[in-house]
Amino acid sequence: MTRTNDASGGGKLPRKRFYRARAHSNPLSDSHFPVPISPEEVDLSQHYPRYFPADKGSDGEEAAAPQQIRFADVGCGFGGLLVGLSPLFPDTLMIGMELRDKVTEYVKERILALRGANPGQYDNISVVRTNSMKYIPNYFRKAQLTKMFFLFPDPHFKEKNHRRRVISMQLLDEYAYVMEVGGIIYTITDVEELGEWMRSCLEKHPLFETVPEEEIKADPVFKLLSTATEESQKVARNGGQTFYAIFRRISLQEE
């Protein structure tokens, strides 16, 4: 049974129907997957082999390596945003972080297929199965990231489950730690109450300030928020509204 579709250039793209999973997973449950002890333990050769070949002694020509991962798509789903961002920022390493195992496997296969069909492209994106609400500091150093994305996260409607939301005052402390000053955090949802919640948390946090609307509209990333992902496309097909909050990491004198 085939699990792929033809991609441009002769590669094979995986079919989503073979990788279906629940819309969301419980971020507070204990899942079993390897977690690096520290950012220094992250094996970049597994994610970006063109830039970080596992065989250091090979005579093959190695591409000049960007220094470190700079973008993180938290809860990346089927990887649409990563695929859209890759050609816009070809010299920037970016990673998707996804808790669902089948969805993570789909994104891995999708990236491999795109690399095979488009030599020299999509080498700067990858995905890892992990729980971002627990392990962000295990993957990124202080001030490492320049962009973080939270697109259509689980709304956790019940008040008792609000502690599972991926944007909270406590988690924003962690996100601020791994973001460089001037870095941008992007959020979008089709649930108005969640949109208000995320904006309120960011407005209250002392290390973030809202990005002016004219700057948002000029940002080439902004359009991708509502077009690149499976969720955003579903909202558009259904004629739904979206609610975004985009904030900049700022500095405090005591930092």
Swiss-Prot record:
Matches recorded under InterPro entries: SAM-dependent_MTases_sf, Trm8_euk, tRNA_(Gua-N-7)_MeTrfase_Trmb
EC number(s) reported in the record: 2.1.1.33
GO cellular component assignments: nucleus; tRNA methyltransferase complex
Biochemical pathway: tRNA modification; N(7)-methylguanine-tRNA biosynthesis
Main subcellular location of this protein, as a coarse class: nucleus
Gene3D superfamilies linked to this entry: Vaccinia Virus protein VP39 (3.40.50.150)
Any one biological process term the GO annotation gives: tRNA methylation
Binding-site positions, S-adenosyl-L-methionine: G75, E98, L99, N131, S132, L151, T229, E230, E231
UniProt GO molecular function: tRNA (guanine(46)-N7)-methyltransferase activity; tRNA binding
Keyword Nucleus annotated: yes
UniProt subcellular location: Nucleus
Region (Disordered): 1-35
Feature: compositional bias, Basic residues: 13-23
Keywords: Methyltransferase, Nucleus, RNA-binding, S-adenosyl-L-methionine, Transferase, tRNA processing, tRNA-binding
The keyword Transferase appears for this protein: yes
Catalytic residues of the enzyme: D154
Family (UniProt): Belongs to the class I-like SAM-binding methyltransferase superfamily. TrmB family.
Biological function: Catalyzes the formation of N(7)-methylguanine at position 46 (m7G46) in tRNA.
Protein name, UniProt field: tRNA (guanine-N(7)-)-methyltransferase
Organism this protein belongs to: Zea mays
